[in-house]
Amino acid sequence: MRNLKTWALAPIMVLSLAACGDKADKAEGGDGATSAASSKTLAAAIGDEGDLDTLEGVIRNAGLSGVLEGKGPYTVFAPANAALGAAGTDLSGEAMKAQSAALLRAHIVPGALTRADILAAIARGGGGGVQMRTMADGLLTFSKDGEAVVITAADGATARLTGDETVASNGVVQPVDGVLVKAG
């Protein structure tokens, strides 16, 4: 019953974040300017970004390219090559398929959330942060540290939004500087 309530709240959280629109001050986002909407899918946008090659390989290995080419919308908090390398886990090969999928689900939330949406939700939350449920059924907490947006997973793993987001036809790619799952 508790799980049903949690899933019932997920669309409400998405709508509360998505309702922010583009009204928030984009200057608040630091170096994360919003790029123009693209006709590319999330999978193509990730594939075109040079610093997300490792993530693209994890997506292929997990067999989730089709999901990120589908309807969506989703927001992918995309760890850069250096972040995935620092995690120290090789997620290639058939034996790592389940781990690859689990890692990806921990970095994807339903809905298309721009940096402005996230900043506006944090501001409405009074600076105490705002939470969003991932596709892995974990909670991510978004807060500000100075001008940076920090994401904290339930297990304590943290990452910051970095670089420019990419608005794709079926969601948003938000680059992050860390992995949102602690190494087991």
Say what each PLM segment does.
Residues 2-7, 15, 20-184:
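Mature, structured domains of secreted/extracytosolic soluble proteins
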Residues 12:
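Contiguous ligand/interfacial binding patches
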